[in-house]
Amino acid sequence: MTLNIKATDFCDASNSAEGVIKAINELQSGDTLIFPKNEYHFYKDRCIHKVCHMTNTDSFKAPDKYFAVLIENKENITVDGCGSTLVIHGDMCAFSLRGCKNVRLVNFTVRYASPTNFEMEVVERSLNKITYKIPTGSAFEVKNNKLTFFEKSPFSGENYYTYTANGECYCNVIHRGDEVFRTSRSPTKIALKIKKTGAHTVECRYFMSPKFKVGDVVAMSRNKLRDNCGLFFESCSDIFCERITVNYMHGFGWLSQMCENLSFDKLTFKPASGYRVSSFADLIHVCGCKGYVKITDSHFEHPHDDAINVHGAFLRFRKACDERTAEL
């Protein structure tokens, strides 16, 4: 007998992580996990975490990965979002399949409450002063002449992440109308004085203002650390994804590694309103997979790296099990 298992039978949409884990544990072959249309909020300090390796990330520096939704070792299941949005709070992976076979993921949106690319829009400019507007979802403070971005847990009061724009943000991209280009210029590193002038504005004073224009949006990577990815498939086969919208992904985009037969149809990678960047790095990233990878009828917009990246991988050789088998 197959069942439709509703996430709302196990969780409150305002704090979904622990209840969704219980719902996933109930899934059997042929079942569908349904998210009745709503916004489902996932907070990092309420989510599951495991040590695992993700290619192209700093897994040695950050081996412990946090997951908003983690489905492991399930076969012949469907996850139907019914148009829902998964809202991610914290620098973690939004959705992961590990060791799964014949899974359909359909009709949901992934949105990060506070993206980890930091954006500053030029709203006023003079010879030695620029005022920048920061999106409403990005919390920040100015202290000791340093601009710091952060996201705070509502449970512990501790920050999920804290990054200082003056020193840590190293890769700057300017969005100017339909143009997007990389620049070595920084809104903060050469600032003589940084002052918070409103709930969402900062003023930077310079010896000579950078040659930004009013309307430019400067997008900054928080630092070089790729400690996780936005969505993650590992050792899975026959996975079908359809009508999924991604507003942003932390870490390293939508990563599939050591998988077989993947289909991506009608995906939309588009920043949420008020933002310009849809991913900290790549959008779809495929490593060490076999069979087919089909990407059809999809829209890709403004990642901070590649839209699609497919490659093999160097793996660590651990030991020879026999003449034909190695442990990697």
For the regions a language model picked out, list residue spans one by one.
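Acidic Gly/Asp/Thr-rich repetitive segments characteristic of extracellular carbohydrate-active
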Residues: 5-34
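Extracellular beta-rich repeat passengers
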Residues: 89-100, 107, 238-243, 256, ...
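Autoprocessing Asn-cyclization modules and mimics
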Residues: 95, 111-176, 309-328
